[in-house]
């Protein structure tokens, strides 16, 4: 299990269920853990405002799956690491480690410094592999599917709608979109 230190002890028991909007998402995650591994299992794309508990819930799921190689990646930090990996030739190794995780959580997707290279040669490669191998993939974001697609379409070359659609098609295949509402719990 590859989890940030602050997430390692979070369990389902730590999740506040005082808001009905959180219960459905929580129950979906509990079902995922109870039925893992199952070939029909799809990940979640949980989006919402900052501090509502998106990352917290997925950290609890990862902890509950501690026997499984679950990896949580803060996606903006990962993209910086990949860019820095160009110097030492570790880009492929870094991408392979993420794309091959048994269960993957891409945390805070859309918050990274956007570039066409990251979208097409990093994110799309990871998602394509996970789609073909049918590996469970979860996402957190402040962006809905539609908003993330719009963000991914704006490249240096102008309109890159088709490239963004390719990425979003893979995300939609891998995960069900869920809007998590609530108060900021930080």
Q: Can you describe what each PLM-predicted range is?
A:
Residues 38-58:
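Walker A/P-loop nucleotide-binding motif
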Residues 23-27, 62, 66-101, 116, ...:
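Short glycine-rich substrate-engagement loop in P-loop NTPases that contacts/grips substrate
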Residues 39-40, 98-101, 132-134:
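Short loop/turn elements that form and flank the Walker-type P-loop nucleotide-binding site
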